[in-house]
Amino acid sequence: MIKGYEEEEWIPKTRLGRLVYEGQVTTFEEAVRSGLPIKEHQIIDLLLPGLEDEVLDITMVQRMTDSGRRVKFRTTVIVGNRDGYIGIGHGKDVQVGGAIKKGIENAKLNVVRINRGCGSWECGCGQAHTVPYKVSGSSGSVRIYLMPAPRGLGLAAGDVAKKVMEMAGIKDVWTRTEGSTRTTLNFAKATYNALLNTITVRS
C-alpha cells in the first residue's frame, strides 16, 4: 500500500463486482467467461490477491492554464504474478503517490492471462517458459517482436521489455525492436500488446 493512502471499504457498483463480492464468481477465468467488463480494481484484488506491482516510469507534465502553470505527475505501472498474469496502466495526479496509486488501479483493470509454452525448435522441454510462437506488438512508433527461445537463454531484451516479461512469467525469449525504444511508455505498451497476441492470433 502506498504511504498516505488507505484503501476505502469496497462497495461494488457493477454487476460483476457484486458477483465477486458475494462469492458467486471466485476465479479470474470465471470473471472473463462471464462476458462482463472488469471496471473495478477490487475485483482483481479479490480474484488475484498475489499480484505484484512495479513502477516503470514517472514523468512530470506541465500545462499552462489561465491561472498559471499546472504540474502533474504521470506514471507507467505494471502488475503481475510472474506466472501468466500481466497488466499495464497509467496514472496522473498532482502528487506522485496519487499518480502511482491510479496507475496500479488502472493496470489491474487491464490484467490478462497470457499463453506460454515451449515454442522453440531448439528446446522441446515441454515447459511453459517462453512464448508459444512468434508474436509482435506496437505502440506509437515502437514495434517489438517476441520469438520463442530455448530454456536457459534468458530474456534477450531491453530493460523495459524485460521487466514486463518477467512480471508475466516469460523466462526465455528472443526479441527484435523497431522505433524509439527509449520511450518507456510506448516500449512497455508494445511489449504488453505483443503478449496479448499470445491469446488471440498466431503470427
Curated annotation (Swiss-Prot):
Entries under SUPFAM superfamilies matching the protein: dsRNA-binding domain-like (SSF54768), Ribosomal protein S5 domain 2-like (SSF54211)
Keyword Ribonucleoprotein tagged: yes
GO cellular component, one term: cytosolic small ribosomal subunit
S5 DRBM domain boundaries: 51-114
InterPro entries tied to this protein: Ribosomal_Su5_D2-typ_SF, Ribosomal_uS5, Ribosomal_uS5_arc, Ribosomal_uS5_C, Ribosomal_uS5_euk/arc, Ribosomal_uS5_N, Ribosomal_uS5_N_CS, Ribsml_uS5_D2-typ_fold_subgr
Gene Ontology BP, a term: translation
Pfam families assigned to the protein according to its UniProt record, in alphabetical order: Ribosomal_S5, Ribosomal_S5_C
Record's subunit section: Part of the 30S ribosomal subunit. Contacts protein S4.
Similarity field: Belongs to the universal ribosomal protein uS5 family.
Protein's name in the database: Small ribosomal subunit protein uS5
Record organism: Methanothrix thermoacetophila (strain DSM 6194 / JCM 14653 / NBRC 101360 / PT) (Methanosaeta thermophila)
